[in-house]
Curated annotation (Swiss-Prot):
Family: Belongs to the SmpB family.
Pfam families named in the record: SmpB
Keyword DNA damage: no
Keyword Cytoplasm: yes
Entry keywords, A to Z: Cytoplasm, RNA-binding
UniProt source species: Staphylococcus aureus (strain NCTC 8325 / PS 47)
Function in brief: Required for rescue of stalled ribosomes mediated by trans-translation. Binds to transfer-messenger RNA (tmRNA), required for stable association of tmRNA with ribosomes. tmRNA and SmpB together mimic tRNA shape, replacing the anticodon stem-loop with SmpB. tmRNA is encoded by the ssrA gene; the 2 termini fold to resemble tRNA(Ala) and it encodes a 'tag peptide', a short internal open reading frame. During trans-translation Ala-aminoacylated tmRNA acts like a tRNA, entering the A-site of stalled ribosomes, displacing the stalled mRNA.
Protein's recorded name: SsrA-binding protein
NCBIfam families referenced in this protein's UniProt entry, alphabetically: PRK05422.1 (NF003843), smpB (TIGR00086)
Length: 154
């Protein structure tokens, strides 16, 4: 059975948790245009294949797809534009230092509303190898079987 999204969650990157080991998370605000937030509230955002990057001392979210707003007419946004993330300078420096290490990247894990503002949960992640992914799937299956047996027993 599929998990239900929490009320504030607008989009989730479940593939990231499969492809990466998430070592640290941080919450960031995101600069959006009017038609973008309207489209996001409708559930038209996709975090798959997106990543965050430090450029000129600022953090940007790249490759996040937000579908055009249907009623947006000529003022509609570009679906794949880079979007600026709102973080403190020390947080940007810390994340930049962590991603300079080989194998680390910053991936968005969740897009949600908090007090009416759109936020992104970023994860500092290290890529998994294929054998790590297989091992994780085996462990998950064993855990599920044990839980099923325990439920049947009691």
């Amino acid at each position: 059975m599929a998990k239900k999204k929490s009320p504030g969650t607008l989009a989730e990157n479940r593939k990231a948790r499969h492809d990466y080991n998430i070592e640290d998370t941080i919450e960031a605000g995101i600069v959006l245009q009017g038609t973008e937030i309207k489209s996001i509230r409708r559930g038209s955002a996709n975090l798959k294949d997106s990543y965050a990057q430090v450029k000129n001392g600022e953090m940007y979210l790249n490759n996040m797809h937000i579908a055009p707003y249907e009623e947006g007419n000529r003022f509609n946004h570009d679906p794949l534009r880079s979007r600026k993330l709102l973080l403190h300078k020390r947080e940007i420096i810390k994340l930049g230092d962590q991603t300079r290490e080989i194998g680390y990247s910053i991936v968005p894990l969740k897009l949600y509303l908090k007090h009416g503002h759109c936020k992104v949960l970023l994860g500092v992640a290290r890529g998994k190898k294929k054998y790590d992914k297989r091992q994780a799937l085996k462990e998950k299956a064993v855990k599920r079987d044990v839980a099923r047996d325990m439920k049947a027993r009691y």
